[in-house]
Amino acid sequence: MGPVMLDVASYELDAEDREVLEHPLVGGVILFTRNFHDVAQLRELVRQIRAASHERLVVSVDQEGGRVQRFRDGFTRLPAAQAFAALNSVSEAQRLAEEGGWLMAAEMIAMDIDISFAPVLDIGHQSAAIGERSFHEQPEMALAVAQSFIRGMHSAGMKVTGKHFPGHGAVSADSHKETPRDPRPLAEIRAHDMLIFKALIQSQQLDAIMPAHVIYTEADPHPASGSSYWLKTVLREELGFDGIIFSDDLSMEGAAVMGSYPERAQAALQAGCDMILVCNHREGAISVLDNLSPVKAEQLTRLYHQGSFSRRELLDSPRWKLANQALTSLSERWQAHKNGEK
């Protein structure tokens, strides 16, 4: 299995998709809204992806809830992370977050999807890229809710990816469109943004981490996703993280400062990433596959889902019915809350 995760064009695989997925450097596929028409089509697409490679690829999606939910029709409308604590008592926020993590993961596993890149562990709501995707503006409260969400994901059989290390919440710029710079002192980043990552690593609750395409100017001239300081010195050595490190999508503008697509890929791997995402730019992905040195990434097999239930079994279960009702209600309350603020 190789270290490259990429995307496919549409609702079903075309000839180029199949050829790309057979490449020995490919280890995973990430799905987007453009890959989803309905539940039956999605199930068939995942089957095609499984059949296209000699390896069992890691199939992934961003199904966080709120504004980042790639699959909607036929799936529970999940509330934004901010909604849990914003509209409920602490104990109720934790209860609903655990059900949210479980239900999100279970609905994906029932489609034979291994991971949803969640949860977002960034602190605060001021960043354009993060906003309602963050659990809370206070690190301690964000941690309390995140722990419950993670417990739910794990109970369904899905591995957890915390993002975006060491914290994207304090920069207003959107790394999808530019390379944000965070000028704060390192001591502040460590005491505020990194607190949640440190706590979850110490309690061994994170299976994977995705770093930010943000330059922390007091630490390093490179974005964290291409920084050996952040990934090796801090994450591996100082915090003792031994899970999988993903790059965020190397086609985002935040990664452009790292050079051409092959240069970005090489920089991310050399900095300490185990798997690199190259999405929404097929030409860039192919140039990475053509130019990257052979790399084996067998540790990525740890990311496979552990569920063995069917979608019908899930939808018939009392837990799903109760969770679906509670989370749909919270999602509607959150939408009404936001509309009332405008």
Swiss-Prot record:
One of its GO terms (biological process) is peptidoglycan biosynthetic process. InterPro entries: Beta_hexosaminidase_bac, Glyco_hydro_3_AS, Glyco_hydro_3_N, Glyco_hydro_3_N_sf, Glycoside_hydrolase_SF, NagZ_Beta-hexosaminidase. Transmembrane segments: none annotated. Pathway: Cell wall biogenesis; peptidoglycan recycling. Substrate binds at residues 62, 70, 133, 163-164. Coiled coil: none annotated. GO terms for cellular component: cytoplasm. SUPFAM superfamilies: (Trans)glycosidases. Keywords: Cell cycle, Cell division, Cell shape, Cell wall biogenesis/degradation, Cytoplasm, Glycosidase, Hydrolase, Peptidoglycan synthesis. It holds the Pfam family Glyco_hydro_3. The record marks 174 as: Important for catalytic activity. It is found in: Cytoplasm. It catalyses: Hydrolysis of terminal non-reducing N-acetyl-D-hexosamine residues in N-acetyl-beta-D-hexosaminides. GO terms for molecular function: beta-N-acetylhexosaminidase activity. Its main location: cytoplasm. Its EC number is 3.2.1.52. It is an enzyme of class 3 (hydrolase). Plays a role in peptidoglycan recycling by cleaving the terminal beta-1,4-linked N-acetylglucosamine (GlcNAc) from peptide-linked peptidoglycan fragments, giving rise to free GlcNAc, anhydro-N-acetylmuramic acid and anhydro-N-acetylmuramic acid-linked peptides. NCBIfam families: PRK05337.1 (NF003740). Belongs to the glycosyl hydrolase 3 family. NagZ subfamily. This is Beta-hexosaminidase. It comes from Pectobacterium atrosepticum (strain SCRI 1043 / ATCC BAA-672).
